[in-house]
From Swiss-Prot:
Keywords: GTP-binding, Nucleotide-binding, Repeat, Ribosome biogenesis. GTP 2 binds at residues 194-201, 241-245, 306-309. This is GTPase Der. It comes from Buchnera aphidicola subsp. Schizaphis graminum (strain Sg). CDD domains: EngA1 (cd01894), EngA2 (cd01895). Belongs to the TRAFAC class TrmE-Era-EngA-EngB-Septin-like GTPase superfamily. EngA (Der) GTPase family.
């Protein structure tokens, strides 16, 4: 296992900003808004080219009694228990706050290596304000400005690297890092998307068989995208929990806008997508828009109807027929009825995930593509335009993931949408794509008998 460093501190001290800089990603949502991070968010920091450590972004520690804050607090404590070291972040502009003495006491109970990171030092002229933090009693401390990338190299080279080298043998860590990178590369990435409160986080907890994600009846509990590795039947998967896609448009809510953008980016980066629908709400306009975006992204789609324990067999059948009717223009492999809370029907998901993933990765030969095109044309010829029949000459694979087929011919720009759809469906059924969308591009071939001027 890679060494684990956890980022701890109050809300809005810059943990997510530092997490993004150390991991060289934008995985953690950052805004001037307290309580944005709720679940543990894992990333990787490379100390050298072949040597990396795990870093964990956590929710800001506060001592409120609300349910979500309590669950966030529990997640942070779990991160401290499993880690090898702690970066305790404080805000230089605020000075020492009373909660930070309480946080210090909690950290010391676990007897973990701790480095005090005094963040947001840019523009601070009062040295006495920074010196206040020494009263927290940590021997090792460093001053940085995460948002200005100031002091980050010192943090890595003078603090993290020497400590990791003293605790872990270099060659062993390099080997672990390489094995981990290989495992991550071979993992199937699955985006879990849907409206707020449909049970995305509950589903991941059910598959993992432990409470990894924060859940509640309150819509919008998950704000960030969170990657959760799961091993099942000796295979590695990464499930990505996302913020619920709400149909409400709020001009003032920038957080909601950022969440939507990150969810759409997650779909594009994943191998396949689970569209989760609440059995009580049935399928909505928002679900249809999401399924359309998934198809345009070229990702396999699996429909998951959650909370199906509330439906009778007849209601399930009616809902299944309704979804098939509403999504008749979209490609999806299967409709799964589950109850994530009761762990019913969740194991069957892995079979569909494996089938859809392997289908999307299949290699298609040019000869096979040509053969299918000729079969399609023989069965239903292209239309005649201006006295001449549109001629499809040859076809080949343009891209493999997402699958894109290039068809060359004469007058292909005049092909009707109806005929294009016919070709698309013909290729889809013949290749047995099983929920994986196909893109078809048409290219006009040059007539060699027309002289070039």
């Amino acid at each position: 296992m890679l060494p684990i460093i956890v980022l701890i501190g109050r809300t809005n001290v810059g943990k997510s900003t530092l997490f993004n800089i150390l991991s060289k990603t934008r995985n953690a949502l950052v805004a001037d808004y307290p309580g944005l991070t709720r679940d543990r968010n894992y990333g990787y920091c490379y100390l050298k080219e072949n040597k990396k450590i795990t870093i964990v972004d956590t929710a800001g520690i506060n001592f409120k009694s609300q349910k979500i804050e309590k669950q966030s607090h529990e997640q942070t404590l779990k991160a401290i228990k499993e880690c090898d070291g702690i970066l305790f972040l404080v805000n230089a502009r605020d000075g020492v706050m009373p909660e930070e003495y309480e946080i210090s006491r909690k950290i010391r109970k676990y007897e973990k290596k701790t480095i005090l990171v005094i963040n947001k030092i840019d523009g601070i002229k009062e040295i006495s304000k920074i010196n206040e933090f020494y009263s927290l009693g940590f021997k090792e401390n460093i001053k940085i400005s995460a948002s200005h990338n100031q002091g980050i190299n010192n943090l890595i080279s003078k603090y993290l690297t020497p400590w990791i080298n003293s605790k872990f043998k270099e060659k062993k860590l390099e080997k672990i890092s390489q094995e981990h990178s290989k495992k991550e590369k071979n993992s199937v990435k699955i985006a879990c998307i849907g409206k707020p409160n449909v049970g995305k986080s509950t589903l991941i907890n059910s598959l993992l068989m432990k409470k990894r994600m924060i859940t509640s009846n309150k819509a919008g509990t998950t704000l960030d995208t969170v990657l959760v590795p799961i091993k099942y039947n000796y295979k590695n998967y990464i499930f990505i929990d996302t913020a619920g896609m709400s149909k409400k448009k709020s001009k003032t809510n920038k957080i909601e806008k950022f969440c939507k953008i990150k969810t759409l980016q997650t779909i594009e980066k994943s191998h396949l997508t689970l569209l989760i629908i609440d059995a009580k709400d049935q399928i909505s306009k928002q679900d249809l828009l999401l399924s359309s975006f998934i198809e345009k992204s070229g990702k396999p789609l699996i429909i998951v109807i959650n909370k199906c324990d509330l439906l009778s067999l007849k209601e399930k059948k009616n809902l299944e027929n309704l979804i098939k009717k509403q999504l008749k223009c979209n490609f999806f492999s299967k409709i799964h009825f589950i109850s994530a809370l009761n762990n019913e029907g969740t194991v069957e998901l892995f079979k569909s995930i494996d089938t859809s993933y392997h289908t999307s990765q299949k290699k298609i030969k040019t000869s096979q593509v040509m053969k299918i095109m000729h079969k399609a044309v023989k069965k239903h010829q292209p239309p005649i335009i201006n006295g001449r029949r549109i001629k499809l000459k040859y076809a080949h694979l343009g891209n493999s993931n997402p699958i894109e087929i290039m068809i060359h011919g004469n007058q292909v720009k005049n092909l009707s949408l109806c005929y294009k759809k016919y070709l698309k469906n013909f290729f889809y059924k013949t290749l047995k794509m099983n929920g994986t969308p196909i893109k078809i591009q048409f290219k006009e071939t040059m007539n060699p008998y027309i002289s070039k001027k």
